[in-house]
């Protein structure tokens, strides 16, 4: 008699995805972040669901409803800070996951990579909308500044912005619709994650050497289930340290002031995970140019398979490309720092140079370096 997990219509899907899935025997801890992202998504949906039960999406009561959740609801503060810092963990895992994909050439699985980019955009949109909901000063002004960027679209820009606002400024209608979309999008993300996995399981996982591993596969369970649980425990530990010891470390103190359309905060800036893109946006002294650069800073990932000129897939044995990769990481950290600084000398010029370097590394330097490495290996 066949094992029920292999014969039952539902269980066999789970079996083929998480139990009997053949996986390369040499994938490292950099491959843990996919499962961690799945856990983050589930955590965000659960905490978000319970927060939504106590939230009121009206400009008059939104700020107070969040305060009420923190003060009067049993463990409401835990829910709120798990959700806020869970978003930070989500983005840390996301950026490490994408970085792993770039380093080891996982982008050569184009379908998986492309839906991953769409997922990244969707998660960023969801996080932005979530940041508006507490209706503090930074929520309101962040929403005003970022939605206003759409007015840079030629001809239809102003109409587009007013259509999104539901009026002539960020107000009650805006908050209500952003709450609706913030609630809806994670479920769409969940569906897209399934498609992401579907495409991945068509090809199987990549591995650190970037070579086919069909001759050396091991079952996902127990080897990688145990490995994923270790990663999960470490992530939960870091998250709980954040939530229980310094829940506001990554937030902005301005958001503890109720939204006031009549007073602008001294420095409007998004959450830390958007600062690199915000720095790129600000480094171009033209509104439309800045918006284009902002979108391209993520969309450029779609070109990674087209810009791959190396005869090897992974960077594991390409020291010059490795140097460029870590330069790119350092550049992104620099941009993140600049995004949180005021617009004044010397931050302006540093941001502009870092932005130029970001695009140069990806579009020009990496493909050229790969060609040089091919010649060095006489390929």
Curated annotation (Swiss-Prot):
Classification via InterPro entries: Cyt_b/b6_C, Cyt_b/b6_C_sf, Cyt_b/b6_N, Cytb/b6-like_sf, Cytochrome_b, Cytochrome_b_C_euk/bac, Cytochrome_b_N_euk/bac, Di-haem_cyt_TM
PROSITE patterns documented for this protein: CYTB_CTER (PS51003), CYTB_NTER (PS51002)
TM spans (from-to): 33-53, 77-98, 113-133, 178-198, 226-246, 288-308, 320-340, 347-367
Membrane topology: Multi-pass membrane protein
Keyword line: Electron transport, Heme, Iron, Membrane, Metal-binding, Mitochondrion, Mitochondrion inner membrane, Respiratory chain, Transmembrane, Transmembrane helix, Transport, Ubiquinone
Positions contributing to heme b b566 binding: 97, 196
Presence of the UniProt keyword Transport in the record: yes
Cofactor(s) this protein cannot do without: heme b
GO biological process: mitochondrial electron transport, ubiquinol to cytochrome c
Protein localization: Mitochondrion inner membrane
Cofactor note: Binds 2 heme b groups non-covalently.
Record keyword Transmembrane helix present: yes
GO MF terms, alphabetically ordered: metal ion binding; ubiquinol-cytochrome-c reductase activity
Chief localisation class: mitochondrion
A GO term from the CC aspect: mitochondrial inner membrane
Annotated residues for binding of a ubiquinone: 201
Binding of heme b b562, residues: 83, 182
Similarity remark: Belongs to the cytochrome b family.
Subunit composition and interactions: The cytochrome bc1 complex contains 11 subunits: 3 respiratory subunits (MT-CYB, CYC1 and UQCRFS1), 2 core proteins (UQCRC1 and UQCRC2) and 6 low-molecular weight proteins (UQCRH/QCR6, UQCRB/QCR7, UQCRQ/QCR8, UQCR10/QCR9, UQCR11/QCR10 and a cleavage product of UQCRFS1). This cytochrome bc1 complex then forms a dimer.
Other notes: Heme 1 (or BL or b562) is low-potential and absorbs at about 562 nm, and heme 2 (or BH or b566) is high-potential and absorbs at about 566 nm.
Function: Component of the ubiquinol-cytochrome c reductase complex (complex III or cytochrome b-c1 complex) that is part of the mitochondrial respiratory chain. The b-c1 complex mediates electron transfer from ubiquinol to cytochrome c. Contributes to the generation of a proton gradient across the mitochondrial membrane that is then used for ATP synthesis.
Name of the protein in its database record: Cytochrome b
Organism of origin: Myotis welwitschii
Gene that this polypeptide is encoded by: MT-CYB
